[in-house]
Every structure is written in C-alpha cells, then in structure tokens.
Amino acid sequence: MHRTYVPLKKGFILTSNRDENHQRLTLSPRKYTHDTETIIYPKDLTKGGSWFALNSGKKSIACILNAVAEQPKDEYPFSRGQLLLESIVNHDFKLETKRLDQIAPCVLLTYSFEKYPVFKEYSWNESDLRINNIDISQPKIWCSNTLYSGMEFEKIRKSFEKSLNVLTTRDSIFEFHKSVSQPLNSDVYLIKNAGIKTVSSTSYHYQSNTNELYYKDFNEDKVTLLKNL
C-alpha cells in the first residue's frame, strides 16, 4: 500500500494504492450515511470498512495503512477499516482515547481542510502511539511496512521525489502510482504467495472548492469518477 500527498495551489491531491488479496470483494466508491453524515468511500465487503474515505460536507479526508506489530496477535476486536470510518464521521476523533489494545497496528492519516487545515498522522505499533502534524505545504509518501521492506520503500520514495516536478495533475500522479503497483504474488512483497497484488488506486483532487474522486479497479479494469462531491 502506498499513499501520496501532493500540495497544489489552492488545493491538493491525495492518492492511495491498495495491495490486497485479489479475491477480496470490494465495492467501488459511493455515498453512505453515517450518523447523519454523508461519507464517500470504496467499501471492503469482508469487514464493511474502508481504507480511504471522504466527508465532503465537512471537508475532511482519511486513509489508513497496515503496519507491523512488535508482538502481533491472532485477532483484533476492532477493524482498522471501521476505525477509518469512525475517524471521518466523528469530528472530535482522537485515536489516543481508544482501546488501542483492540486495534491492529496501523498508520492513520486524517486531513481536515475546511477553514484551518489540520493534517495528522497517527502511528500505532501495538506498543507506542505517535501523533505527528504533517506540513501541508510539502509533498509526502507513505508505504505499508507489512508488505514493503525499508529498502524497497527507499527506492519508491526516491522515485517519488525525482518525479515531483511533473506530479502536478491527477493523471500524472496516477501514472506514478501505476508505476509502483505490483502484480500478483510480486517478489517485492514481504508476505509471499498470499494472492496479493495492487488491486486498485483511489485519488482525491481538491482545488479552488472543486473536487473529484477517481477510482480505478485493476481487477476489472473499471474506472469510477465522482465529481462535485
């Protein structure tokens, strides 16, 4: 899984590659109602959560990556995909107030861009919770350490930084994400022969109060484009 954030004049583009078992069922992005809030996201049908969600009414967006546990458990009561949805519905959300022992390790990114932009990174490794404020004026890339080694991430990060001068549109950023997508059971993955591949890419483009959500399902070679959300 990769996430990239690219700031623009009066806006930004946040993009996500999803690496998952290619047989895991997913719905393309659509609107759902949660506690009177309209939330837009692609839905994981196994647990009902998501990895990328938008609350356009409140101008907030969130995405999540899996992370490595220091002492992994067999099961966790609370789904990371459900945690993501809670973070986008609850405007007073604070991960530090949650029962962290019930949540698998993850990196949760939340960005509120309504009046006073706040971009937070929550990193939970089952031992420590670190909370960082992200500089919204600087581009950034994240990578899931459950699937990619530190060395592999460094390669991808350097490629991202070298490409920044051309990463100015949704199409160019999507092409970058396509270039780092992985085929079925890629040798790059730390988890071997688990039926994993890059199954989709999701990109949200916000600029001067106009926005759109672009989703490409690589399994079905199908595009979903939602505008004026």
Where are these regions (language model features)?
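N-terminal nucleophile
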Residues: 1-229
